[in-house]
Amino acid sequence: MSSSDHIHVPDGLAESYSRSGGEEGRAWIAGLPALVARCVDRWELKRDGGVRSGEASLVVPVLRADGTRAALKLQMPREETTAALIGLRAWGGDGMVRLLDHDEESSTMLLERLDGSRTLASVEDDDEAMGVLAGLLNRLHSVPAPPGLRGLGEIAGAMVEEVPSAVDSLADPEDRSRLRGWASAVAELVGEPGDRVLHWDLHYENVLAAEREPWLAIDPEPLVGDPGFDLWPALDTGWERIEATGDARRVVRRRFDLLTESLELDRGRAAGWTLARLLQNTLWDIEDGLTAIAPSQIAVAEALAKP
């Protein structure tokens, strides 16, 4: 790769790694241009457009030697990147961006190129967009679970055990009662955590337009568990748009009904595992120093409550 192709690391990505990764994160960012150059040379690639980034990864559009459009995804090696690689291999491109190659040492992935400028959020009809999500989830959940992924039982059990020491961090007694209630609901489900491969973060922004299919999922954080645990990102996605309707409860309930019917899920279990996501999110917020349950979390819980 020539000097004119030198990668400029986006400021947002550099700041994210500096904030969350400390010295190790800053060192990884400093070595990122050289890592891109090595991967381009190794796979005989050619740069093909400007880079994109999120909080954790850099995506570099490239062309393969045969002219095929692809994308390099670079992310600091972590447990999550290992899980993503396992999941991508298991799905084999079925409803998911296809893994073309990877570098195990650096966790760099060579992926098929999708249209990063067009996400599922661009679909104005919410029922239509939710139908796309449901179809993708159904395909992703149909793949047998590969070895090497964390199980939902372990994760959910740890959350329930954490509640007694975390709940007093919430200032409002009603919030403390909510958290205990969610934990009780999850405790009833821990013994049957499920055996499907879950995406964990499938929402409108993690579905991109593609060439071989209209839409494909990206950025999985796979684990093995009950499909009901995969619903919350879909229920919460585009929250500002939900609030703009003036009836968040109706929209969330409509989405829940559509998803559970399409995926043929037991509604009670799906609601319980969605409460597990609300519990998880709130415990993370408490770790970050927050003292109240986020209003959107409460709204989802109320929408799923029995009439």
UniProtKB/Swiss-Prot annotation:
Gene Ontology terms, MF aspect: aminoglycoside 6-kinase activity; ATP binding
UniProtKB keywords: Antibiotic resistance, ATP-binding, Kinase, Nucleotide-binding, Transferase
Active site per database record: 201 (proton acceptor)
Gene Ontology biological process: response to antibiotic; secondary metabolic process
A Pfam family assignment: APH_6_hur
EC number of the protein: 2.7.1.72
Cysteines paired by S-S bonds: none
Name of the top EC class for this enzyme: transferase
Top-level taxon in the UniProt lineage: Bacteria
Family according to the record: Belongs to the aminoglycoside phosphotransferase family.
NCBIfam families: APH_6 (NF012171)
Function, in words: The aminoglycoside phosphotransferases achieve inactivation of their antibiotic substrates by phosphorylation.
Name of the protein in its database record: Streptomycin 6-kinase
Organism: Streptomyces griseus
Gene (name only): aphD
